From Swiss-Prot:
PANTHER family assigned to the protein according to its UniProt record, in alphabetical order: TESTIS, PROSTATE AND PLACENTA-EXPRESSED PROTEIN
Presence of the UniProt keyword Cytoplasm in the record: yes
Gene Ontology CC: axonemal A tubule inner sheath; motile cilium
Keywords: Cell projection, Cilium, Cytoplasm, Cytoskeleton, Flagellum
Quaternary assembly: Microtubule inner protein component of sperm flagellar doublet microtubules.
Cytoplasm listed as a keyword: yes
Main subcellular location of this protein, as a coarse class: cytoplasm
Protein function: Microtubule inner protein (MIP) part of the dynein-decorated doublet microtubules (DMTs) in flagellum axoneme. May serve to reinforce and thus stabilize the microtubule structure in the sperm flagella.
Known tissue expression: Expressed in sperm.
Native species: Bos taurus (Bovine)
Protein name, as recorded: Sperm microtubule inner protein 8
Domain of life: Eukaryota
Length: 216
């Protein structure tokens, strides 16, 4: 905010200072080089991905791009900190050494921490040995089941959404378990042309499905 000051002459030859009402003058914000003010990992005013994309599309230089400049000063970075939402009842384990770590550290300083490398003792580790014995007993008592015969050319199942005929014949699924629209690693897949039709057809058993046809 700035004031325009005028010197108003009076009749006696003297001048008096006259201050006009305040006029807001827009002052452009100063951009600072990020490497000159930032010395830590935390950024108090991290630019958004949309702003970085816009600056990249506009081909901004390094002194105007938000990836290399910031409006924050060095004091903002030095005084930047983050706090948890309220005082936690139980401190996070990542903020300090845990109780187990404190006990192990005390035992290590006292020389009472024995190495575990030679082997696992049954007295010190009863839960591990008991789990091994229980698993061995469970595997021994489990019943056997017969695998399906691999000589059959067409396997038949009940209660599953599978093909009625071999894939080489139909080239299509009888039942589709994928929701529409579906997602892949690149985003949402395009909708087939008849997905939203009230009386859509899935094609015959001997025709290719719609998603195998090219998109126009």
């Amino acid at each position: 905010m700035a004031r325009i000051i005028d010197l108003v002459p009076w009749e006696d030859g003297s001048t008096h200072v006259y201050a006009s009402p305040a006029i807001l003058l827009p002052i452009p914000r100063r951009r600072n080089q990020l490497a000159g003010v930032k010395q830590q990992l935390y950024h108090p005013a991290l630019p958004s991905l949309r702003r970085m994309d816009m600056d990249s599309v506009k081909a901004c230089l390094s002194d105007e791009h938000c990836q290399s400049t910031t409006y924050c000063r060095k004091d903002d970075f030095d005084n930047a900190y983050f706090t948890l939402l309220g005082v936690p009842n139980k401190p996070l384990q990542c903020l300090d050494i845990t109780e187990t770590g404190q006990r192990l550290r005390n035992r290590y300083h006292e020389g009472k921490l024995a190495p575990i490398a030679p082997g696992i003792n049954r007295v010190d580790w009863p839960c591990f040995t008991r789990a091994i014995e229980d698993w061995s007993r469970f595997v021994s008592s489990a019943g056997e089941f017969k695998l399906p015969c691999a000589s059959k050319k067409v396997e038949s199942f009940s209660g599953y959404a599978v093909r009625y005929l071999k894939p080489e014949v139909t080239q299509s699924w009888r039942f589709c378990l994928n929701q529409n629209p579906s997602l892949d690693r690149y985003g949402q897949k395009p909708l087939p042309f008849d997905s939203l039709n009230a009386f859509r057809r899935f094609g015959s058993n001997y025709s290719r499905v719609n998603y195998l046809t090219p998109w126009h």
